[in-house]
């Protein structure tokens, strides 16, 4: 159990005062400050090609998951710092402020737009990498756990499974994803229809703010505690630890992988029925879809005589035995024709491995659950993602439009995540994540390619943007919803002169109002009616905008009328 320390005070008085004054001084100043305050685990950008160069780039690349941001021309951090304790984390924040370095916080490095390891505003910046702060402490008596902000989702799952086979946590399927960022943005996963998001199951947190204070839920206040659950990472401070609620699951669950390749017409018919059925299934049953263009030998028919144009993969998790899965699916969705050999019974932790990138296309993973602790992910690639929410059933013509656009790009994917269940029952203002009742499913558009295809990156980027525009009539509007954990810079970015409030003298209410209104363009897509409350929370916890990125929430230093809109 982590102690609930409200304020760390250990000879940092002078450092804190210097930091808030914006003293500056460059990398030498930062180096001296870190060493003086017992922070030794860091790597400085190399000025020559030697061992330090190798160490720096190995560290930079280790958790850099989107290779779009690994190119040599991309901005690089001056220093990469790996704090080993909360004391070192506090010192790191204050030293970075003293030396006037922008802070980018990295947990697992899965930011869709690289915001945890790249800064495009021209300021010198550092990466504060939390990988050394990855302890998970489980307390079965209270059915809670403390997970440090650098722990991955896989590490949390593994720690729970080591002490219980009937407890779980509701989060995503990527085991190498960092909990600090994932939970900050909401954290949707296969248990969300049953238990809500990861952030819905946070009962306390330890946040280190820009002044080096370590704040628990009571100390930060309910407005900030509300904001850090679903309001997006990189905004409020650095999450030192989450206290999460453990969730009861049966000893045996059932997983299914169901492949139904065929013509666009055939797949569209399945999807039309799927969108009606899945939001209304029992909460214990989640049935998602992964879609990609068919890239198969002509003689591979998969028992289907129709031409293979689209390759859909239906992924199911049911909190119960296989017999019930088959009964429910064949009663509610007979068109899918789920077969006995397409489903397997296993423990919940085995299902986490089954649906992870550690398994092959058929879900085979050797059942070695210790692999969930691995931080490094093989097979990294280049990718761009976008998201949508669907509130009304998509017509047959609409589904065909989806598939026609998908077929244009062999590097493209679609992911349909079903809503309903607990996602309908939890109030849309319970936490900062707002996409609740009224959503049938969420869409993730993905273009993913390898290095040998990177010369065509502009083609892939143009494709996904065109796809997104084509889908406008079929998805939510006023505003068009988006998921903050799938950041999309196409929606807009903060302007340098608006959001870089580097010190007190640069503040003025007019520019802050402009910044807040500019950010509303994408802020309301991510947060709907919760945007203004997030601005208030940001102003309360980080008025100088120390923790920021290209789509962070700006603080309000003046006053303005709350914006009104209607969500359709």
Swiss-Prot record:
The PTM Pros-8alpha-FAD histidine maps to: 110
> Known EC number(s)?
1.1.1.-
Tissue specificity is: Mostly expressed in roots.
This protein's superkingdom? Eukaryota
Q: Supply the induction statement.
A: By jasmonic acid (MeJA).
Q: Which residues form the FAD-binding PCMH-type domain?
A: 73-249
Subcellular location(s): the record lists:
Vacuole
* Keyword rRNA processing in record: no
The protein's predominant localisation is other
User: Record keywords: Glycoprotein included?
Assistant: yes
Query: Any one cellular component term from GO for this entry?
Result: plant-type vacuole
Q: Where is the signal peptide?
A: 1-18
Using the record for this protein, list the coiled-coil segments as residue ranges, or answer none. Answer: none
The record's statement on gene disruption is: Strongly reduced nicotine biosynthesis but accumulation of dihydromethanicotine. Inhibition of jasmonate-elicited formation of anatabine and other pyridine alkaloids.
* Keyword annotations from UniProtKB, A to Z: Alkaloid metabolism, Disulfide bond, FAD, Flavoprotein, Glycoprotein, Oxidoreductase, Signal, Vacuole
* Any GO BP annotation: alkaloid biosynthetic process
Cofactor or coenzyme needed:
FAD
Q: In which pathway does it act?
A: Alkaloid biosynthesis; nicotine biosynthesis
Question: Under which main EC class is this enzyme filed?
Answer: oxidoreductase
Pfam family name, one: BBE
Task performed by this protein:
Involved in the biosynthesis of pyridine alkaloid natural products, leading mainly to the production of anabasine, anatabine, nicotine and nornicotine, effective deterrents against herbivores with antiparasitic and pesticide properties (neurotoxins); nornicotine serves as the precursor in the synthesis of the carcinogen compound N'-nitrosonornicotine (NNN). Catalyzes a late oxidation step subsequent to the pyridine ring condensation reaction in the biosynthesis of alkaloids.
Q: Which family does it belong to?
A: Belongs to the oxygen-dependent FAD-linked oxidoreductase family.
Which protein, by its recorded name, is this? Berberine bridge enzyme-like B
